[in-house]
């Protein structure tokens, strides 16, 4: 006797929930990396479903670079109160002492110090042996190589040639001494799946994803939002109010906006169906040849 036929989104949801439950059962000290973006919002929703009516049995960790959009930090703090999850926030103290910023030090150095090293510091500090992340295989070519259980060595480095097979959705959680894993429950989701699921489940997301008039300047073909007074303007540069939104969120000086009139979820989904460009086209760090995504991941990046 066959069971009920699940829709595409229901199949993805069931797979992700299974991964959450399996890791929670197998590992001693898991954590969920919370970057506050749309994928993190879906990940949080799935984690709440996986353990309902109980509380999520692990904390959420935000590695704060000190350069996130103000609306992201506001959303993070409100979400922690609304959903009652344990929130850990870590900032690299050495980076803060250096006055690390993407303007003086460059995007690659800033990302390495405040994101990669900051993450490794937090993982070591709390002794986490498994870290959930919201990466998807459709985002970028190095992420397409990643397993659901992504093994990292004692220095949190990723070796794409030294990973475990995952046949028939069977995951090998046996880690060697000093190893840990990053876990990606959204591996098989696409950007369109994410937006359709957000619409279906009525998931809260940062308002920056919706079009609004915002102060931006254009640099090297990228629209950068001037989010606070710390952003140095070039000679003759004047922020212009444009109707824009963001497809991806990160440090505000390193995240490009797109011109858009999509003020609703249905509007965003309609844009998605017509889009022929990557959501990460607005990430300045992805265009830094000295800081490719695969190189960052090998060094311990998300």
UniProtKB/Swiss-Prot annotation:
InterPro entries: PAPS_reduct_dom, Rossmann-like_a/b/a_fold, SO4_adenylTrfase_ssu, Sulfate_adenylyltrnsfr_sub2. One of its GO terms (biological process) is sulfate assimilation. It catalyses: sulfate + ATP + H(+) = adenosine 5'-phosphosulfate + diphosphate. GO terms for molecular function: ATP binding; sulfate adenylyltransferase (ATP) activity. Coiled coil: none annotated. Transmembrane segments: none annotated. Pathway: Sulfur metabolism; hydrogen sulfide biosynthesis; sulfite from sulfate: step 1/3. Pfam families: PAPS_reduct. It is an enzyme of class 2 (transferase). Residues 280-302 are annotated as: Disordered. Its EC number is 2.7.7.4. Keywords: ATP-binding, Nucleotide-binding, Nucleotidyltransferase, Transferase. With CysN forms the ATP sulfurylase (ATPS) that catalyzes the adenylation of sulfate producing adenosine 5'-phosphosulfate (APS) and diphosphate, the first enzymatic step in sulfur assimilation pathway. APS synthesis involves the formation of a high-energy phosphoric-sulfuric acid anhydride bond driven by GTP hydrolysis by CysN coupled to ATP hydrolysis by CysD. Belongs to the PAPS reductase family. CysD subfamily. Heterodimer composed of CysD, the smaller subunit, and CysN. This is Sulfate adenylyltransferase subunit 2. It comes from Shewanella amazonensis (strain ATCC BAA-1098 / SB2B). The gene is cysD.
